[in-house]
């Protein structure tokens, strides 16, 4: 098919109108990508959003439109934006349009080497329905809101309560222990965090650049000529970034770009068998935020709180693709920024509907110095049932929630009248609840550099044993501080006895 050629007719920020003159010209389809070569030789990719008038299409640019002017030639590709696939994508970093941003050269992404970013969700009969627990080694998560393998997990929290640290710890714990493939989509977050994450992945061996490169990195260098390209195929992760400084078009599409690579890993192709994939998104709110910017630029009438009228449709189209099939599974962990700590805001509220487990991070708990600042009473999981987890786990989780709920109800009385006015039974409940609350904290591997405490993974059996001992009153003699930032109950007992001996 011959390529359709048009001209730039109007530019308003990231919105570019393209006119296609000539008789019987076939306009590009919705979501097709168009390409413009700027004067400096860089290629700008546009995505068709709507047809306006007889020969004109309205597009959103995937990069800055600086330097573009009316009259520039635009070439239709005949396809949506394509992402590269195949064994060479392991260990690589891409942007929203599938170009490499790690300085190691682009990969082919046309024909059988590429996948479009806009695809249908798997058919109903292809879906997998098994329920299996994915243990993370993080006490509060494994006990109170266990994650399902092949499920969708949301980390909700306002600014600065620890979403990115928690997602990095999950990558560290699950990606290392899971041994499978991970895809990380950085959507509208800080570029610095992407840089930190890449260095962390190299140090932990999840991404392999080879020994020569690692020696140069240890000495403060970043010599890409030393990267072992064939050895990179042994890597276990791929990154797709569209960070805060990108135009809204890129931020609105980068989650889909990452998802296409995750779908390729899940379904396999040719000799590649389907696999179990971990798909991390930081931050899904920025996907909604960028969609709202794009919607306003395209002149659509906003709905509640200024969000796009198509919010539920866009979220549904993306979330329904993140699922497990008979070939493989995608377990997705999505950080969700909560504007002004308001969980009823349309963006987090729309995301809630799609999730199997929710981990809510609370500023009040962060203020107490308890990290991870997970709110055990607000967080939920679909698989917190006795027939999936067993009676012992389920009963322990319910006892922990019960004692924390009782403490929460008594807090007003304590604030007004003080502890002295409580009954002996209530005083005992409060002291045990405070120990439980502190024991829900845990030192993280990725936070070692600023806590100075080595990170730990805690087995679920140790977690259940520890909380049962606290609630049964076996550790009432130990000071509360002994339970803060400890891994297993044994660590807490040792610390407590040491404190008593020193007192």
Swiss-Prot record:
Reaction it catalyzes: ATP + H2O + 4 H(+)(in) = ADP + phosphate + 5 H(+)(out)
The entry's keywords: ATP synthesis, ATP-binding, Cell inner membrane, Cell membrane, CF(1), Hydrogen ion transport, Ion transport, Membrane, Nucleotide-binding, Translocase, Transport
Cited InterPro entries: AAA+_ATPase, ATP-synt_VA_C, ATP_synth_F1_bsu, ATPase_a/bsu_AS, ATPase_alpha/beta_chains, ATPase_F1/V1/A1_a/bsu_N, ATPase_F1/V1/A1_a/bsu_N_sf, ATPase_F1/V1/A1_a/bsu_nucl-bd
CDD domains assigned to the protein according to its UniProt record, in alphabetical order: ATP-synt_F1_beta_C (cd18110), ATP-synt_F1_beta_N (cd18115), F1-ATPase_beta_CD (cd01133)
EC number: 7.1.2.2
PROSITE patterns: ATPASE_ALPHA_BETA (PS00152)
Subcellular compartments: Cell inner membrane
HAMAP family recorded: ATP_synth_beta_bact
Family: Belongs to the ATPase alpha/beta chains family.
Protein name as it appears in the record: ATP synthase subunit beta
Organism annotation: Flavobacterium johnsoniae (strain ATCC 17061 / DSM 2064 / JCM 8514 / BCRC 14874 / CCUG 350202 / NBRC 14942 / NCIMB 11054 / UW101)
